[in-house]
């Protein structure tokens, strides 16, 4: 699986904070034994403005891009539970965010809360993520984070909601986040089976 995430912080804009993801599902055979089926290549994307109540959870500072990049990285796994059990190459255009995600540590308490949620949720999803740097100009997720959908339209990408995990849950124990991941993945699996039967 290939994942790109991005964040935008433009304090002078009407919508100052935005997060986005793009996910590429390669064509592949899925299932086991005689139940195997071919699933065609597809793209999905999502973006959203970060609400004020979420921004108020961050420590006051002039620059929030680091926290927003981490929020985008967590949000894609929360929004796309089909990433469960997958090997993921995840591209981000912010080296500080990549370092924090790899180490699982930040000296900033608000960033540390996001990293805690990411680590626990990833364990619950059983997703194996490999983080790589991508220059901003080559990061396809930079486009939806700035309300540009032309290329994604050409790729036939389907829009999905970008779901920011509820902040009230961010301080929950790791076990709760793992259970949350399993529940979301199971719900998505049931919905996907329903969509296939309806075809």
Where are these regions (language model features)?
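RNase H catalytic domain
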Residues: 78-141, 146
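Short, flexible loop/turn motifs enriched in small residues
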Residues: 12-18, 83
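Two-metal-ion RNase H-like nuclease active-site motif
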Residues: 1-13
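A short, polar/acidic, helix/strand-boundary loop motif
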Residues: 26-71, 96, 103-109
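Positively charged, lysine/arginine-rich intrinsically disordered segments
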Residues: 193-197
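Buried hydrophobic packing segments
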Residues: 72-77
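Short beta-strand scaffold segments in enzyme catalytic cores
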Residues: 19-23
